Amino acid sequence: MRIIAILAAILLVALQVRAGPLQARGDEAPGQEQRGPEDQDISISFAWDKSSALQVSGSTRGMVCSCRLVFCRRTELRVGNCLIGGVSFTYCCTRVD
């Protein structure tokens, strides 16, 4: 009877040792799938009619502009900064023909 109890205890310990790394791998997987702030891109576009376009400064008239997280795209020109919710973004514009 003692031999069966000892063998059962050894078997349980062996199963716990094997299950431990599986749980650790399962905990790591969600962290690997999360995207960091450097991967995120925010784009906010503005559209207006001609009457309100007269109120816009001449430097951005005839352009489509967006607030980007860090850098402008290759076809865009950095015009300034956007402040949204207390966070500063890069203000990028491209010409509309």
From Swiss-Prot:
Disulfide bonds join C65-C93, C67-C82, C72-C92. Pfam families: Defensin_1, Defensin_propep. GO terms for molecular function: protein homodimerization activity. GO terms for cellular component: azurophil granule; extracellular space; Golgi lumen; transport vesicle. The three-dimensional structure formed by the three intramolecular disulfide bridges is indispensable for effective bacterial killing. Keywords: Antibiotic, Antimicrobial, Cytoplasmic vesicle, Defensin, Disulfide bond, Fungicide, Secreted, Signal. It is found in: Secreted; Cytoplasmic vesicle, Secretory vesicle. Host-defense peptide that has antimicrobial activity against Gram-negative bacteria, and to a lesser extent also against Gram-positive bacteria and fungi. Exhibits antimicrobial activity against Gram-negative E.coli and E.aerogenes and Gram-positive S.faecalis, S.aureus and B.cereus and the yeast C.albicans (in vitro). Inhibits corticotropin (ACTH)-stimulated corticosterone production (in vitro). Inhibits enzymatic activity of B.anthracis lef/anthrax lethal factor (in vitro). Homodimer; homodimerization seems to be required for killing S.aureus, but not E.coli. Interacts with CD4. Interacts with Bacillus anthracis lef; homodimerization is required for the interaction. Belongs to the alpha-defensin family. This is Defensin alpha 4. It comes from Pan troglodytes (Chimpanzee).
